[in-house]
């Protein structure tokens, strides 16, 4: 069988979107599109990573990201193993380095890590021989979420990112999702706007490649997409928020706001949602919503990431070759 030659994947790890060139980004997205097609078939499992092992090391609570990686690994026929902080020696005072070295002794091919400390994924990547995927480190980065968001927007926009406008709405200060999306989408020529209470904007935000708004009615004018962020309710207890009812009145995205956006504007949310606080239920379930598309994109994109890291292949993967590169 003939195989089409493709560029080899040069990275051992995926730690941040900033490490990817434009060509590498679109190679990853093209690979995700192939897996997205496979995921729509009656039989979704392929033997591509049979014999490979993936450890899901989540030292922070997670449902969506962890499940998405687990499904992605299993659909590639990899063996996946989950480790939560409560079930690891970290909860007994063991250092991250010692836990990581213990995991490496088990010879996994990939470790997917989520940790409350910024830089935790890079710390592991510099010390371990296996590949490391950053599934969220503190407030620093969430590269796989930004990649799946980019994939979801590409399904609507095609490759025409230049000149588009995206509004990110909500708790920017504590959002690694916002940081990764700002870096990735602005690098593609997307004009990024932020809208949040002043207390929920991060220090140094004026150095970001963004335009900042305090009023949602102004921020949403003419945008091509709105990304709502989860409002972390513990911030309200810390005095960073006004009354929640007041917040919803000022910053909850509604169908009225979407009438001010571009005619084909779409809505995204990384989840979990607080309906009626960050986004109205009507809009979350509307045809303009890409929220469920993001979930499907998450599995396909993470399949692509695991595949590229585990094989670093230069051979195009096709469904008809049984998943063998």
UniProtKB/Swiss-Prot annotation:
The keyword Chaperone does not apply. Coiled coil: none annotated. It comes from the Bacteria. InterPro entries: Asp/Orn_carbamoyltranf_P-bd, Asp/Orn_carbamoylTrfase, Asp/Orn_carbamoylTrfase_sf, Asp_carbamoyltransf, Asp_carbamoyltransf_Asp/Orn-bd. One of its GO terms (cellular component) is cytosol. Gene3D superfamilies: Aspartate/ornithine carbamoyltransferase (3.40.50.1370). Keywords: Pyrimidine biosynthesis, Transferase. GO terms for biological process: 'de novo' pyrimidine nucleobase biosynthetic process; 'de novo' UMP biosynthetic process; amino acid metabolic process. One of its GO terms (molecular function) is amino acid binding. Disulfide bonds: none annotated. Pathway: Pyrimidine metabolism; UMP biosynthesis via de novo pathway; (S)-dihydroorotate from bicarbonate: step 2/3. The keyword Transferase applies. Carbamoyl phosphate binds at residues 64-65, 114, 142, 145, 271-272. It catalyses: carbamoyl phosphate + L-aspartate = N-carbamoyl-L-aspartate + phosphate + H(+). Its EC number is 2.1.3.2. Heterododecamer (2C3:3R2) of six catalytic PyrB chains organized as two trimers (C3), and six regulatory PyrI chains organized as three dimers (R2). This is Aspartate carbamoyltransferase catalytic subunit. It comes from Nitratidesulfovibrio vulgaris (strain DSM 19637 / Miyazaki F) (Desulfovibrio vulgaris). The lineage of its organism: Bacteria, Pseudomonadati, Thermodesulfobacteriota, Desulfovibrionia, Desulfovibrionales.
